[in-house]
UniProtKB/Swiss-Prot annotation:
Contracts smooth muscle of the gastrointestinal and genitourinary tract, regulates growth hormone release, modulates insulin release, and may be involved in the control of adrenal secretion. GO terms for biological process: neuropeptide signaling pathway. This is Galanin. GO terms for molecular function: hormone activity. It is found in: Secreted. Belongs to the galanin family. Its main location: secreted. Disulfide bonds: none annotated. It comes from Gallus gallus. The keyword Secreted applies. PROSITE patterns: GALANIN (PS00861). Keywords: Amidation, Hormone, Neuropeptide, Secreted. The modification Threonine amide is found at residue 29.
């Protein structure tokens, strides 16, 4: 499963920001 940690670690800060935006759109915040 993908997490903010794994996304940030594997892809970089831009991936973390993108993931946050994704979560926000789905109301997972």
């Amino acid at each position: 499963g993908w997490t903010l940690n794994s996304a940030g670690y594997l892809l970089g800060p831009h991936a973390v920001d993108n993931h946050r935006s994704f979560n926000d759109k789905h109301g997972f915040t």
